[in-house]
Amino acid sequence: ALAALLSDLSERGMLEDTLVVATGEFGRTPFVLKQNPPGRQHWPKCFSSILAGGGIAGGNLYGKTNRKGEYPTRNRVRPEELAATVYHALDIPINDPQDASGLSRLLTTGKPILDLFG
């Protein structure tokens, strides 16, 4: 379904004006736990995200884990950096946005990952 959505947006010339984000707040244990029944649990040390459109350069991977997928080894991304990247793609000011009542609010303390943009 995600591939079809991205294809449709691209074919209609809408992908550059649309940011698609698919993410989760945690991964799964990179090993099968010895429990009954055996299985995997939440693993907060690594998670995956897909960002497409909205100025994001396509066909790239960002970040790397160790061989077992347990821990980030390069370009670790924290949730606040992911949020800042989304706000940047949508041209939403991070440090001084105003809500509908005119109040200024700090949306995130993270910095956008500019290497993701083409």
Where are these regions (language model features)?
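Ligand-binding pockets and gating/stacking loops
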Residues: A1-G118
